[in-house]
Amino acid sequence: MSGFGAAALLSGSSAAAGTRSGSSDSLEKIDMSLDDIIKLNKKEERKQYSPKMKRGLQQNRTQQFRTPGSKWGIQQQKGYGKNHLGHRKKIVGKKRPYGVITGLAAKKAMGSHKGISPLNRQPLSEKNTQRNYPILKKKPNLQRQTEMQRKQIPALRRPAPLSRRIGNKLNQQKDTRQATFLFRRGLKVQAQVQPTEDLDNQAAKRTRQWRTSTTSGGILTVSIENPGAIITPISQKLRLTRTPVPPFLMKKDQSEEKKIPKGVPLQFDINSVGKQTGMTLNERFGILKEQRTALSQNKGSRFVTVG
């Protein structure tokens, strides 16, 4: 563009800018490019037309919710090691020790030692703990009292005769249950139960309450049927309750004569041969062969045995 065009633009922009822009501003704008001049003019226009009262109200509203040194309600730390999200950075290698008293307990403990250096403090003893730490001394006393009360209460409330009667009744009930169970299985049971008056008299004689009696209140006698001991013969068929077995499955009586198995009958006893140490088996068999040949010759049989 020509110099005249630039001068015309500058004059228009200076008129729009108002009284704030002086001769010094116009001289600076001569050296700037057209784009920079347009941007500056827009900024100045925005500043003029934006009302100042609204800005003040908005700032007051935001300041109500903000604290000094905070951004968007998040507290920010100042100095070294701050985190932009508002949380402290963990120091590497440093852990919180166990057993550290915190909160109200720490304030109470520190209240007694305020203004006293650790070197001048009194050593821990029973008297000092009562003075300085009354909370620590109260707890064991309360625990002891509760333990003593627990031990005394059952001793006072224990009704001795009632408990014994209940125990005897339970034993009797147990005996009756056992008797019914065995009776259903086919066993005759006679439960001899002692009367309650005798049991009460026995309980009164005893002095020590905590020892339980070894003898039970009821005596249980069981009689089991033994068929072998009965003299009168009872047929086995009547005794069986199962279904009758068919005759072809029944085992045959062993009274029948045992059939001799087929094979060559030995004419000598092997055990006796083994006992005779002077004669061998070959000699014995040789003698038998000679006897056979002699018998066959006498009978005149057709067969000839070659020795």
From Swiss-Prot:
Q: Where in the cell is it found?
A: Nucleus, Nucleoplasm; Nucleus speckle
Q: Where is the composition biased (Low complexity)?
A: 1-25
Its keywords, alphabetically, are: mRNA transport, Nucleus, RNA-binding, Transport
Give positions of region: Disordered: 1-28, 41-85
One GO cellular component this record assigns the protein to is: nucleoplasm
Q: Which GO terms describe its molecular function?
A: mRNA binding
Compositionally skewed regions (Polar residues) per UniProt: 57-78
Q: Name one GO biological process term.
A: mRNA export from nucleus
What is known about the tissue distribution of this protein? Widely expressed.
Give a Pfam family name.
Answer: FYTT
Q: Where is this motif: UAP56-binding motif?
A: 26-44
Work out whether the entry's keyword set contains Oxidoreductase: no
Record's family? Belongs to the UIF family.
Q: What does this protein do?
A: Required for mRNA export from the nucleus to the cytoplasm. Acts as an adapter that uses the DDX39B/UAP56-NFX1 pathway to ensure efficient mRNA export and delivering to the nuclear pore.
State the name under which the record lists this protein.
UAP56-interacting factor
Q: What is the lineage of its organism?
A: Eukaryota, Metazoa, Chordata, Craniata, Vertebrata
